Amino acid sequence: MAAETKVQVSDPEAEFLNSKQETGYEWELFKENVRPLKRGRNVGILNHALKSHSDHQLRKNLIEKRRNLIEAIDEYEGDDPLSPWIECIKWVQEAFPPGGECSGLLVIYEQCVRKFWHSERYKDDLRYLKVWLEYAEHCADAEVIYKFLEVNEIGKTHAVYYIAYALHIEFKNKVKTANEIFNLGISRDAKPVEKLNDAYKKFMVRTMRRSNTADEEPKENNDLPSRSFGTLLSRGDNNARRQALGSSNPQAKKLKPNQSSKTPFAIYADAVSDTTSGNQPESDKSRPEFGSWLMLGGRAERNKENNSLPRKWASFKVPQKPIVRTVAAASASTFEVFVDEEECTEEEEEKKKNDETISSSSNVLPLNGGREIKKETELLRQNPLRHFPPNSFLR
C-alpha cells in the first residue's frame, strides 16, 4: 500500500517542470531569467521558449527554427536584404529570453552589421543603426563601436545615436566629451530634434546637480575639525580650544588669574635610569652588576654572532629506501572514461548538418549551440570589431 502512494511535490516550480501541461504562466517561474526588451515580449512565444528548459525536444525545435531563419537569410533574393536579418534577430530575442552565449544573438549582431557597414543604402537606415546600438549594449566597451560609426558616418542623421553615445561617455565620467557629442548632434540637426534637445536638457540638469554637490561638500567639512593621524593642530588652534574649554569647565575658574597656559612644567626623572647612565655615583661603579655595561668590547666582540664560518651541511645523510617503480602497477591504475554513445551520435548529426550549412552559405555562421558559438560570443564581447578589415577604421 505504501509503495502505491505517490509523493506529493511541495515545490510548485518542480511540480510544473515534472508536468507536461502548458498553463500559460510559464514566465512566472522563470521571469528572473528573462532579459527585458524595449518593445515588450509576446507572451505566447515567451511561454513556449521557457518550456524548452524542461523539454529537450522543444529545445531542438528552437535550434532547428533558428537554422532555418539563417538559411533564409542566405537564400533571400528580395529588394531589402536587411529585412531577413531583422526578422531573425527579433525571433532569437523572443525564443531565447535569457540571451546568453547559447542564443547566438551576439554572433548574429556582428555578422549583420559587418554585412552592410560599407553599404551607402543602409548608412542612414534607422533599423540598421538600432542593430549597431543593440550590439554595443552587449559588448564590454561600446566606445569602440560608437567611434567606428562616427568614422564611417553611420547613423549620423539620427538623434538616437548621439544620445546613446553621450550617455555611454557620461557613464564613464567624461562629462566634457559627452557635452561635445550632444552639441555635435544638435549642430547636425539630428532627427528627431525634440528628443535630442530633451535628452540634452536632462544631461545639463544632471551635470549642474553634480557640480553643486561637489561645491557643497568642502563647505560642510570646513565646519568640523580636521583630525588625521600624524598631524598636529596649530598653536593658535590649541589656545583657542583651551579658552573654549576653560569657559565651559567650572574647574577652570579655580585656577589663579596669573596662571598661564605657557607655564613651564617639571620633567620627570627616573632614578633607575640615572644609575645606568654615566652620571651614577662612584660608589655604584664598583659594583659587579654594572661591569657588563661598562665593558662594551670591540667590534669583533659585539658582532661575533654574525661572523660564523660556513660549514658543510652534507656531513650527515638520511637513510632512504629505494623506490621500485614497475610498469604493471602504473598500467593497473588506469581507468576507462565513460562515453555516452547516444550523445555522441546526436553531436555527430548536428556537426554534419553544420558542415552542410557551411558549404551552402558563405555569409552566415551556422548556430547549433555548441562550444564554438560560446567561444565566439566571448571573443566578440571583448573585441566587437575583430572580424572587420583594418581599412574600415579609416575615414
Curated annotation (Swiss-Prot):
Induction: Cell cycle regulated expression with a distinct expression peak at the G2/M boundary.
Keyword Nucleus carried by entry: yes
Entry comment describing in which tissues the protein is expressed: Expressed in actively dividing tissues, early in organ development, in young leaves, lateral root primordia and root meristems.
Keywords for the protein's UniProt record, in alphabetical order: Cell cycle, Centromere, Chromosome, Cytoplasm, Cytoskeleton, Kinetochore, Nucleus
Top-level taxon in the UniProt lineage: Eukaryota
Region (Disordered): 210-263, 342-395
Classification via PROSITE patterns: BUB1_N
Domain BUB1 N-terminal: 69-224
GO CC annotation: chromocenter; cytoplasm; kinetochore; kinetochore microtubule; microtubule organizing center; nucleus; spindle microtubule
Pfam families to which the protein is assigned, alphabetical: Mad3_BUB1_I
Ranges annotated as biased composition (Polar residues): 245-263
Renumbered ranges of motif KEN box 1: 219-221
Motif (KEN box 2): 304-306
Motif stretch (Nuclear localization signal): 118-125
Keyword Nucleus tagged: yes
Family annotation (InterPro entries): Bub1/Mad3 (IPR015661), Mad3/Bub1_I (IPR013212)
One GO process term, biological-process aspect: mitotic spindle assembly checkpoint signaling
Region (Necessary for kinetochore localization): 59-206
Segments passing through the bilayer: none
Compartmental location: Chromosome; Cytoplasm; Nucleus; Chromosome, Centromere, Kinetochore
Function of the protein: Essential component of the mitotic checkpoint. Required for normal mitosis progression. The mitotic checkpoint delays anaphase until all chromosomes are properly attached to the mitotic spindle. One of its checkpoint functions may be to inhibit the activity of the anaphase-promoting complex/cyclosome (APC/C) by blocking the binding of CDC20 to APC/C.
Record's comment describing the protein's domains: The KEN box is required for its ubiquitination and degradation. BUB1 N-terminal domain directs kinetochore localization and binding to BUB3.
Subunit-level organization: Interacts with anaphase-promoting complex/cyclosome (APC/C). Part of the mitotic checkpoint complex (MCC); interacts with CDC20-1 and CDC20-2. Interacts with MAD2 at chromocenters and with BUB3.1.
Protein name: Mitotic spindle checkpoint protein BUBR1
Organism: Arabidopsis thaliana (Mouse-ear cress)
Source taxonomy: Eukaryota, Viridiplantae, Streptophyta, Embryophyta, Tracheophyta
Name of the gene this protein is made from: BUBR1
